[in-house]
Amino acid sequence: MFITKNVYQSSGMRSTGLWGANIFLLIDNGVTLVDTGLRGRSANILNEVKRLGYKPSDVAYIIVTHHHSDHIGSLAELKNATGAKVMAHPADAPYIDGTLPQPGPARPRWLGKLLSPLSSMWSTVPAEVDKLLNDGDELPILGGIKILHTPGHTPGSISLLIPQEKLVIVGDLLAHRFRMRMPPGLFTVDVEQGVKSIKKLAGLDFNIIAFGHGAPIVNEAREAVAHFADKIESKAKGR
């Protein structure tokens, strides 16, 4: 579905019925992908590109919000199929290019055994990162995309502020399924840092917010984030 005239959101559903992350197609004289979903999604994503009237070679860039496998599972295949340049934050790049192994979640042993049958789905293939993105960088796409370093879920998590569209894409800084929430603590390296990143986000100017998981909020999104930031801060203080 189109969130704005130039930003398309594709759900992360696989044929198995299990959910991965949302994928975003930014349309501006070609296509920029934001995240790539679980492994095995590349054909579906390229079909979306074609359905919107573009060729695989029209995909110039792939921006990675963070290194988790439900966001980069199809990255290597899509990079090879399109020739796109991959961009990510320096703190997450070593996990994307295979310099460092993907860290497992902070989970009890029994949960690891429960998830082990899904290991092939959650696996990743290393992909070269062509450009490192730092806080405050601006990309010449859709009138200028501002890179926000929003760590917490991972050390190198980023969000994308697109003033022209009055939109911010936040990866897994927040999720929105029935209500706004933080991502699961089992898969978050620093919850306290994540709260700080949410407060940082609440101080910016946007009207629409799109998430790695869940439906976008398409009106008064900044106010919703500010309210949520106040709520979690109050909870942390025990009020």
Predicted regions and their residues:
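Short Pro/Gly-enriched beta-strand edge/turn motifs at strand-loop
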Residues: 3-12, 116-121, 140-142
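Metallo-beta-lactamase
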Residues: 38-40, 123-124, 128, 138-140, ...
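Short, acidic/turn-prone active-site loops that include or flank metal/cofactor-
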Residues: 15, 91-93, 173-174
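Conserved beta-strand hairpin/beta-sheet module of binuclear metal-dependent hydrolase folds
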Residues: 1-52, 159-171
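Active-site HxH/HxHxD metal-binding segment of metal-dependent hydrolases
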Residues: 40-42, 50-131, 234
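Short glycine-/acidic-enriched loop or helix-start segments at secondary-structure transitions
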Residues: 19, 43-45, 73-75, 97-98, ...
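C-terminal regulatory/interaction regions
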Residues: 236-239
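Residue-level marker for buried hydrophobic side chains located in beta-strands
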Residues: 32-34, 63, 86, 167-169, ...
